[in-house]
């Protein structure tokens, strides 16, 4: 079952000479964990903003084609309705924090929808995002990673089936980055949420994502299972996307004749340990 269906999507910003998105057609299955990669300016963030209706309802321009998210045509619904279909955590997530305490902020969206159970929804979202017990804390008491989780909780409180995160670990240390992705993994695997991340940290993509979509010049170059995608070393590097270090090491060994060409490149550490078993790596 597809949770997202896009047909012939083309979009241009006002006064732009050329479209930033060009004739995109895509299906995303319910329960997928999709990473979107590509170089700067290829249209990743613009594309994702069509999924929650910011484009074209809030950000105007020339829009054509069809975008359906969880059964709703984005052209036929307002952004308030679409926020309950596709939650979005932006790269500048601090701007999504608007209330002084943790529970106030997590439940604020539901309060604005006049939901009678807004407090319960906020508490539920905080628990799902690993912030249970922090309800009465002030937001300034949170770390950067916890603040990011709070922004995610605000989106989760509306119970959308799709969650979109733009560069979720760009400002975080490895410990908090791991925590963010563990929360996303649980939301995906235990609660059936479809997760879409704009990401360039390919080690995290390898460990957590099910599919990878490469965007280039406003088009989708391909969408592939993660292992297949990350093995396209040269193509990714052309787009300034660096495959996992274990993949790059194996690719170099293969070019040196020390790994067979028919052996698939490893994309995770466990795969690398198996691939490199018995090799002397002194000369890598």
Residue ranges and their predicted role:
Residues 159:
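Conserved catalytic motifs of ABC-family nucleotide-binding domains
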Residues 66-81:
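ABC ATPase NBD Q-loop/coupling interface
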Residues 116-134:
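Conserved ABC ATPase "signature" region
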Residues 199-200:
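H-loop/switch region of ABC-family ATPase nucleotide-binding domains
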Residues 163-166:
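Catalytic Walker B motif of ABC-type/P-loop ATPase nucleotide-binding domains
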Residues 138-142, 146:
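Conserved ABC ATPase signature
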Residues 219-246:
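Conserved beta-strand-loop-alpha-helix hinge in the C-terminal portion
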């Amino acid at each position: 079952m597809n949770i997202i269906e896009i047909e012939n999507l083309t979009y241009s910003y006002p006064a732009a000479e050329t479209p930033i998105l060009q004739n995109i057609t895509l299906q995303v299955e319910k329960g997928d964990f999709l990473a979107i990669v590509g170089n700067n300016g290829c249209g990743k963030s613009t594309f994702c903003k069509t999924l929650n209706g910011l484009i074209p309802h809030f950000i105007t321009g020339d829009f054509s084609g069809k975008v359906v998210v969880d059964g709703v045509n984005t052209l036929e619904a307002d952004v308030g309705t679409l926020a309950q279909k596709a939650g979005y955590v932006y790269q500048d997530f601090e701007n999504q924090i608007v209330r002084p305490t943790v529970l106030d902020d997590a439940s604020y969206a539901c309060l604005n929808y006049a939901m009678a159970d807004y407090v319960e929804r906020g508490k539920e979202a905080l628990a799902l995002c690993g912030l249970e017990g922090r309800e009465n804390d002030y937001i300034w008491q949170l770390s950067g990673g916890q603040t990011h989780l709070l922004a995610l909780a605000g989106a989760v409180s509306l119970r959308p089936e799709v969650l979109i995160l733009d560069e979720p670990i760009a400002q975080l240390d490895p410990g908090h980055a791991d925590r963010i992705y563990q929360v996303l993994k649980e939301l995906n695997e235990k609660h059936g949420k479809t997760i879409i991340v704009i990401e360039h940290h390919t080690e995290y993509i390898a460990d957590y994502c099910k599919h990878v979509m490469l965007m280039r010049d406003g088009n989708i170059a391909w969408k592939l299972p993660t292992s297949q995608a990350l093995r396209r070393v040269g193509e990714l590097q052309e787009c300034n996307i660096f495959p996992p270090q274990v993949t790059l090491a194996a690719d170099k060994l293969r070019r040196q004749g020390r790994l067979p060409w028919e052996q698939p490149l490893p994309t995770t550490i466990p795969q690398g340990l198996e691939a490199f078993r018995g090799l002397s790596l002194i000369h890598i």
